[in-house]
UniProtKB/Swiss-Prot annotation:
<dbReference type="InterPro" id="IPR001694">
    <property type="entry name" value="NADH_UbQ_OxRdtase_su1/FPO"/>
</dbReference>
<dbReference type="Pfam" id="PF00146">
    <property type="entry name" value="NADHdh"/>
</dbReference>
<feature type="transmembrane region" description="Helical">
    <location>
        <begin position="124"/>
        <end position="144"/>
    </location>
</feature>
<keyword id="KW-1003">Cell membrane</keyword>
<keyword id="KW-1278">Translocase</keyword>
<dbReference type="GO" id="GO:0005886">
    <property type="term" value="C:plasma membrane"/>
</dbReference>
<comment type="function">
    <text>NDH-1 shuttles electrons from NADH, via FMN and iron-sulfur (Fe-S) centers, to quinones in the respiratory chain. The immediate electron acceptor for the enzyme in this species is believed to be ubiquinone. Couples the redox reaction to proton translocation (for every two electrons transferred, four hydrogen ions are translocated across the cytoplasmic membrane), and thus conserves the redox energy in a proton gradient. This subunit may bind ubiquinone.</text>
</comment>
<keyword id="KW-1133">Transmembrane helix</keyword>
<feature type="transmembrane region" description="Helical">
    <location>
        <begin position="91"/>
        <end position="111"/>
    </location>
</feature>
<keyword id="KW-0874">Quinone</keyword>
<feature type="transmembrane region" description="Helical">
    <location>
        <begin position="326"/>
        <end position="346"/>
    </location>
</feature>
<keyword id="KW-0830">Ubiquinone</keyword>
<comment type="similarity">
    <text>Belongs to the complex I subunit 1 family.</text>
</comment>
<dbReference type="GO" id="GO:0003954">
    <property type="term" value="F:NADH dehydrogenase activity"/>
</dbReference>
<keyword id="KW-0520">NAD</keyword>
<feature type="transmembrane region" description="Helical">
    <location>
        <begin position="203"/>
        <end position="223"/>
    </location>
</feature>
<comment type="subunit">
    <text>NDH-1 is composed of 14 different subunits. Subunits NuoA, H, J, K, L, M, N constitute the membrane sector of the complex.</text>
</comment>
Amino acid sequence: MIDWITSQGHDIFGMYWTPLWILIRAVLIVVPVLLCVAYLILWERKLIGWMHVRIGPNRVGPLGLLQPIADVLKLLLKEVMFPSQINRGMYLVAPLMVLMPAVAVWAVIPFQAEVVMADINAGLLYVMAISSVGVYGVILAGWASNSKYAFIGAMRAAAQMVSYEIAMGFALVTVLMVSGSLNLSHIVNAQNTGYFANMGLNLLSWNWLPLLPMFGVYFISGVAETNRHPFDVVEGESEIVAGHMIEYSGMTFALFFLAEYINMIIISTMTSLMFLGGWAPPFSSALTNAIPGFFWLVIKVFLLLSVFIWIRASFPRYRYDQIMRLGWKIFIPLTVAWLIIVAIWIKSPWNIWH
């Protein structure tokens, strides 16, 4: 289908087709991601409401389904305030520095077999590199706002993200070791081969089972990387109000929230691709194999996003020193130890991967 569209496009548009096709694919990715963010916020409010024995948003549209549109209109119509002592240029650049890396990551994320904007061999490395840039926007926002609260939040963000990126990096290195590739599609395909996969038990063939500690470390570190509860000391409401976002309003404020929720979806998607078999069904049969792979990936991402929300509703915020201790004294030693175990496992006669 894609090959047919490409050939027809070349025939109709000639030399202009290549940039036009890139633009079309970008729009086809970005627009659904933005819609997912809008309704992820609604799902979060609904789910937390049910956990609190409340109904949640139900006034705008049937069952509250138009609430995200009302929220967007409210933020669009709000005035963007500029405090007098800010560095105006840096102040405006900071939200874009947080948002753009979150959007750029989607260029290499496959949605099912051969459905990816750029199927590059260094896809995993690209995701790790691009996703680490967003913290500079947070630091810039804290500095440019010329506010003590904002600056404290920015410094917390810098320390927290550096701490947990190391553990996340080691977790992804083990995935690289067992799959033998940096290509995200190849990593997914590598999980769906072997003894259990041949029996139709794909669920037991995925990386979550042999790499269980890394699976837990990666997902929990992802919660910390996105500054979500209980790791949200960067914007701890009871301490520093909104942290690095305290001097922002209107759409500039909304861009930070947009980036946060896009990053939540990215972490859930990457966890699904790295550890949960990506677009593969949990059990292989004529019925499950007939269902498009994109459907299975969406289900896995949705369940992981619901875990994000469940964690927010269930756990109190950690102290800053507890967050640092978890990252440096527990996660990093654990990932290094499991990295060594996996390396020995791969070289042993009991190697289950190659």
